[in-house]
Regions:
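An aromatic- and glycine-enriched ligand-binding surface/loop that stacks and positions planar moieties
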Residues: 1-119
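Extended, hydrophobic/aromatic-rich amphipathic alpha-helical segments that build helical scaffolds
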Residues: 1-5, 33, 100-102, 150-177
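A sequence-composition feature that detects small, non-aromatic residues
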Residues: 6, 25, 41, 88, ...
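General helical structural elements
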Residues: 62, 136-138, 159
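Active-site beta-strand/loop architecture of penicillin-binding DD-peptidases
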Residues: 114-155
Length: 177
């Protein structure tokens, strides 16, 4: 891990953090291992995946008609942020914190984007929505469960964290810092 850090081949992503896991930031300076998914209109089902559907909001319970159709209408609402995570972000950086607002949104925030619980429906979550890994219509031109957004399997931020933990456990405080 220390060799990877010393290599100078990678650095932390310096773009909009909310885009780090979207198609907008494919092959960025922080990406170490990434799947190459290519949009091919003649073979769009080649990019079929449950990943986006599982991680996207529970769209069958939402009215997204006011969102200018920027979000994909297919999602099952797994991996929903909980209030405990939201509160930890707020404690660290406040309700206007950059990382908080680039990582997740409250129900009030997505309502301002035109996404609301549909009439007669209810959501089983604590009112927080993943934002860093949202599923847009742009990355899914074929619709439904297909996306050409690359998967990031290893990011440099993870290497830095793992190296700090390993160095600390090994008693090497200067490398851990």
């Amino acid at each position: 891990l220390n060799e990877v850090r010393a290599s100078g081949k990678y650095k932390l992503y310096d773009g909009n953090y909310e885009d780090i896991l979207t198609y907008k930031a494919e092959y960025n300076c922080e990406s170490m291992l990434e799947s190459n998914r290519i949009f091919d209109a003649s073979n769009s089902m080649d990019e079929f995946s449950f990943f986006e559907v599982m991680n996207h909001w529970r769209t069958d319970k939402l009215d997204m008609s006011g969102s200018n159709n920027q979000f994909n209408g297919t999602g099952w609402g797994f991996m929903v942020p909980q209030k405990k995570l939201y509160d930890a972000f707020v404690q660290e950086e406040g309700v206007d914190g950059y990382r908080l607002n680039q990582t997740m949104k409250t129900y009030d925030q997505i309502s301002q984007l035109g996404v609301k619980v549909a009439k007669g429906q209810s959501l089983i979550n604590e009112g927080y929505f993943m934002w860093k890994r949202r599923f847009s219509n742009v990355e899914s031109p074929a619709g439904f469960w297909c996306s050409y957004n690359n998967y990031r399997w290893m990011r440099y931020a993870e290497v830095l964290l793992l190296a700090a933990e390993a160095n600390l456990k090994d008693g090497n405080q200067s490398e851990a810092d």
